C-alpha cells in the first residue's frame, strides 16, 4: 500500500456536527462524466473542481463520487485494480487532495465509493492469487475445485452471467463472483483481506474524505446452506470498520448499499441499544420503484405500504432516498407481477431494460412532464431520509438507450449549447461517451447555461426547493406520520421536529383531486405554504379540505398556536415597518 498522507487537523469542537448527514442534500457525480479540464474527452478531478461553485450555488451539501480508482473500466470503475490509486485519466492523488480542499472550502463534504466485495480480475491481488495458490495472496479470493458450492445464492446479473462460478485456466480452479465474471469476490474469511480493506479506508480518511458509500455489502461472506446474503459475519466486519473509523476520525459517515428489503437493511445500522454500531446511513431501495408505481397507478398504497413495513432505525441513523443513480432503476425488490407492470409502463422498448431493471433517467421515465418531475422531486426531498440527487437530473437530462449496458444514463453533463455540451474541448469522436443530441433532451435544448438564465426553469425550481428543505429541519431530522386521508390518490404525511411541523400533500393522479385530512391535533393553526408564503384557512374540528391540481403538491408549515402572532406579518413587511417608524422618530 502507498504511504498515507498526514491526517488533516480536526475541526474545532464547537464547529462539529456529528449528524450532518441527516440534514444534508447529497449529489452523485461521475468524475468521468462531469467536466473535462484537459481536452482528452474524459471528465477528471480538475474539471470537477472547476464546477464546485455551481454545486455550491445549487445547494449541495455532500458529493458522492463513484469509483475513480485505477480500473480497466469494464464496469464503470466498480472493477477496481488499485483501491488507493487514481485512474490516470481522472488525475492524481494530488488532484484529489486539491479537489477535496476546494470542496471543503465551500462547505461541501465528499464521500467516495469503496468496493469491498470484489476487485477486478486485473488487480495485482488476483493475479498473484491465481498464479501462486500458496503465496501470500493465495487465499485472497474464493476458490473451489468445482462449481457446485453455494447453490442457494442467486445470480444477480441473470442476463449476462450463467453462474456465480467461473473457471480460471491458470490456477485450474473455479473462483466465486456475485457480479460479473471479471469481478472475483474477495475472501473475507482470510484475515489479511479485512486488514487490507481497512488499510485502504485509512488511506482516504487520512486524506480527509468525509465518509464512504460501501458497495455491495450484503455479499461479503459465503456459507453453505445459505443464500450468501446478510450473514452474521458480514455484520461483525462492519462493526469492526465502524469502530476503526469512530476511534480515529470525527464526523465521518458510512453509507450502506444493500439492495434488500427494509427488514434486512435495518440490520446494517447495527445494535439499536447503542444507537447503531455499523453504518450511519443505508439506501432505501424498495421505496424507489414504488414511487414510480404509485404515480402510474395513481394510488398511494405502494408508497405508504412499504414505509409502513419499514422498521424503526436508531436515532443516530438515516435512510438515503433516491430516484435515479448510475445504475438501472432496479426492480429486484418487487414481485414478478410488479416487475412486469413496471417494464410495461416504463420500458416499452426492450433497449430500455438492463438486468432486472430499467436503464433510463428520471426525465424520460416521466415523459419530460414538468409537473411529474416536480412531484417526484418534492417526494424525494420530503420523505424520511436524506435525498440523493443524480447529476443532470436537476436540469432534466435525458438518456441514450442506444449505448450499451448502463452507459445510457452516464453520458456527459450538459453545461452549454456549444460543442460537446461544454463538457470538453476534445474532438467529439474522442469523448468517453457521446453527448445527448436528442431533439428534446439534447444539449442544445437542455443545459445548465440556458436554465441558469431562466428563473422559471427546472434548475432554478430545484434550487429553491433545496433551499426550502434546508430552512425546515423537520425534513432531515423530524418524525414521519402518514395521515391517510379520504382520497387514495393523494399521499399526505406530516414531518415534525420540535416546533417545525410540515404537512406534505401529494396528488399522485394526473387529474385534480380533493382530499379531506384529519388535522385536529393542530386545531386553530393557520397553515402557511412554504414556497410562496400563502396563508391557508385555519384548521378546525372538521376534516380539512384541500384541492390539488394534477400531479400537484403542497408543503404547508403548521405553526403552533404560540407562533401565530409572530408570523401574522411577513418578515419583509415587519422590517419595512420598523424602518419607517425609526425614520419618523
What label would you give each PLM region?
Residues 1-580, 584:
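Active-site and adjacent substrate-binding regions of carbohydrate-active enzymes
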